């Protein structure tokens, strides 16, 4: 049975004073450690700081402050959620990705640090052609909270992007995140991956579900019990969504355009073969910080006689933008071009 933490978890002898902020942090960390959580001190610091509205430095400075009973009860309630293996990001309702503070909820996957490898690989491909300042067209398949798309748009000042998802609730979260980070060049579309998109696109990115169906039950409780299963389950061998991408994306890419996908452990060779079979040209996968092959880049062949570089037609030409301009993104759009749809 999962250990419970109530207000009494912070209780001291009746003759003693109430707990200080620092003592409460230590009490939480001890409980988290006893429960086998991976980062007990960090989780305790974040949860106490979140409730008190204090950043790391301010929390340390407030260590001697006494908690009143109401504060102790509220912090204990947060601790109980974490002991039930609810991820800290879900308790807070937000997660930082690419230095962006993004809202997450039950409809969205919590973005992982290793997914930033996809952003890095996409930007490296764009930089190799000197195209970062161009009016690129980007699609993010299965956008969830919008992490990949919004990270790219913050780095590409003239790019336009569209994120797709089958969950309208997730699209609303992504739309709100776009508003929050000022990404007015984002659009969101209800679509099963690329099914409802109209091309051409210069860059397409995706972090598809890639866990084999039979392996989902063995995932950590923080993932298995709180991330949407539709964002995890990649079919019997974990490759169903890569097959769907291979079947649709080549027709949506401009000649010379790039596809970048996240990989599960051990999937690089199989996914590269799927993409090669439809005429894309894969590059060696990019490793994440743990050395695991995590991002795979595959390009659509350039037209015969096309010179190297996006400027020669592989990417959208430089365009003047205005607040009145729109971009045709297909059907069922939630928001488009320079204006995020109404709340």
Question: For each predicted feature, which ranges?
Answer:
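Short, intrinsically disordered C-terminal tails of secreted or membrane-associated proteins
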Residues: 332-342
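Residue-level signal for inorganic ion chemistry
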Residues: 47, 85, 115, 148, ...
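Conserved AdoMet
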Residues: 3, 41, 48-125
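Mobile active-site "lid"/loop adjacent to the S-adenosyl-L-methionine
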Residues: 210-240
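Conserved Class I SAM-dependent methyltransferase catalytic core
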Residues: 236-299
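Non-catalytic accessory regions of SAM-dependent methyltransferases
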Residues: 1-59, 64-67
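Conserved SAM/SAH cofactor-binding pocket of Class I
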Residues: 114-218
């Amino acid at each position: 049975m999962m250990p419970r933490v109530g207000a009494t978890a912070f209780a001291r002898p009746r003759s003693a004073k109430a707990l200080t902020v620092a003592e409460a942090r230590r009490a939480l960390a001890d409980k988290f450690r006893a429960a086998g959580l991976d980062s007990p001190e960090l989780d305790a610091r974040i949860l106490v700081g979140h409730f008190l509205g204090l950043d790391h430095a301010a929390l340390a400075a407030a260590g001697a402050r006494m908690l009143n009973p109401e504060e102790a009860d509220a912090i204990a309630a947060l601790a109980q959620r974490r002991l039930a293996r609810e991820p800290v990001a879900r308790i807070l309702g937000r997660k930082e990705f690419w230095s962006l503070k993004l809202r997450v909820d039950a409809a969205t996957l919590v973005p992982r640090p290793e997914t930033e490898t996809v952003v890095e690989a996409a930007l490296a491909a764009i930089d190799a052609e000197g195209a970062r300042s161009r009016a690129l067209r980007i699609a993010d398949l299965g956008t969830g909270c919008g992490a990949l798309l919004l990270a790219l748009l913050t780095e590409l000042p003239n790019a336009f992007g569209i994120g797709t998802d089958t969950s309208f609730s997730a699209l609303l979260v992504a739309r709100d995140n776009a508003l929050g980070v000022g990404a007015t060049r984002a659009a969101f579309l209800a679509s099963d991956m690329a099914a409802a998109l109209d091309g051409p696109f210069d860059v397409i990115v995706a972090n598809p579900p890639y866990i084999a169906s039979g392996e989902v039950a063995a995932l950590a409780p923080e993932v298995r019990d709180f991330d949407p299963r539709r964002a995890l389950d990649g079919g019997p061998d974990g490759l169903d969504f890569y097959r769907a991408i291979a079947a649709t994306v080549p027709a949506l890419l401009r000649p010379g355009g790039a596809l970048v996908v996240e990989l599960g452990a051990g999937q690089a060779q199989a996914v590269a073969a799927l993409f090669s079979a439809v005429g894309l040209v894969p590059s060696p996968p990019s490793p994440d910080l743990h050395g695991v092959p995590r991002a795979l880049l595959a390009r659509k062949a350039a037209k015969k006689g096309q010179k190297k570089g996006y400027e020669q037609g592989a990417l959208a030409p430089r365009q003047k933008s205005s607040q009145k301009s729109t971009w045709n993104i297909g059907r069922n759009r939630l928001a488009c071009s320079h204006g995020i749809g109404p709340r």
